[in-house]
Curated annotation (Swiss-Prot):
Catalysed reactions listed for this entry: RNA(n) + a ribonucleoside 5'-triphosphate = RNA(n+1) + diphosphate
Species, as recorded: Angiopteris evecta
Pfam families: RNA_pol_A_bac (PF01000), RNA_pol_A_CTD (PF03118), RNA_pol_L (PF01193)
Matches recorded under Gene3D superfamilies: 5' to 3' exonuclease, C-terminal subdomain (1.10.150.20), DNA-directed RNA polymerase, insert domain (2.170.120.12), RNA polymerase, RBP11-like subunit (3.30.1360.10)
Lineage, highest ranks first: Eukaryota, Viridiplantae, Streptophyta, Embryophyta, Tracheophyta
Annotated region (Alpha C-terminal domain (alpha-CTD)), positions in chain: 262-341
Protein name: DNA-directed RNA polymerase subunit alpha
EC number: 2.7.7.6
Cellular-component GO terms for this entry: chloroplast; DNA-directed RNA polymerase complex; mitochondrion
Spans traversing the lipid bilayer: none
One Gene Ontology term of the molecular function aspect: protein dimerization activity
Gene that this sequence comes from: rpoA
Domain-related comment: The N-terminal domain is essential for RNAP assembly and basal transcription, whereas the C-terminal domain is involved in interaction with transcriptional regulators and with upstream promoter elements.
Chloroplast among keywords: yes
Known partners and oligomeric status: In plastids the minimal PEP RNA polymerase catalytic core is composed of four subunits: alpha, beta, beta', and beta''. When a (nuclear-encoded) sigma factor is associated with the core the holoenzyme is formed, which can initiate transcription.
Annotated segments matching region Alpha N-terminal domain (alpha-NTD): 1-233
Amino acid sequence: MIQDEVPVSAQTIQWRCIESKIESKRLHYGRFAISPFRKGQANTVGIAIRRSLLGEIEGTAITYAKSKNVIHEYSTIIGIEESINDILINFKEIVLRSDSYETQKAYISITGPKDITAEDILLPPSVQAIDDSQHIATITKDITLDIEIEIQKDRGYRIQDSKESQAGEFFIDAVFMPIRKANYSVHSFGNNKKFQEILFIEIWTDGSLTPKEALYEASRNLIDLFLPFLHTEEEEIISDRDEKSESNGNILLSNSISTDIDRMAKEVAFKHIFIDQLELPARAYNCLKKVDVHTISDLLKYSQDDLRKIKNFGKKSVDQVLEALQERFAINLPRNKFSID
């Protein structure tokens, strides 16, 4: 049986990252394609993955701060521009990554004048500040600011009870949510005999983990959620099938890019990826835009000979396009309409 004749139910579902970019230290973006699904399956998976991304991914946050000679959170310290409340709000915004589930202690001991940022926090080895430039406070005089803080790893929100705190102690309402936003969409293709769906997932993170790490963790959490429903014998069968690469419809999170995924991505995904992702020089980019080449799908309609016929589009520009397509999408344009490289 040739590949195109394999039923959808017998094809291994696989995924690939079709777009990835770092918009800033605290904003990472990733777009993923997962397929093939039978009718209705993609929406089911999309809903579950999105909810898992938004509610089940663990994050790290500052949950407690302590400073001597401070009565309450609305106090001000002579020589510091911000009030204690402002400093606590700034602590809440600090993006951290931690490899430990234990409560970690960190310290700030800075003598002014100085602008205090996340870089000035003395963190334990297991904790990393994602953006060292995040502002905490500004010391305007020759005074020393000493603060002890606690860092924890959890998920969701945590509203602290400040009634139990003593003078100089401040419990911080923490947000353990590294996912800024998550969207999904489902696209259908094929005919009545072979109807398939492809799922696209978009993930924005705060930089404490990559979108790919977030997708893996969300998927793992969903799998763990269903494990109690499986018997030991069934788990052994699934394990054996995985070892023999004969699983039917199980989502395999691997980085391999199959021919099937490439073909479907060209038909659907590349229509939504703009040529900006190729990061071409201005000359080549502007020439393509002038002939209405806006997406990768538009570009794939051209052969190498077609590109050379574009006004002011020389050999160097063609080579730049070919190199970018190969590097980012593993695509080779044919030399002409009648050949395939």
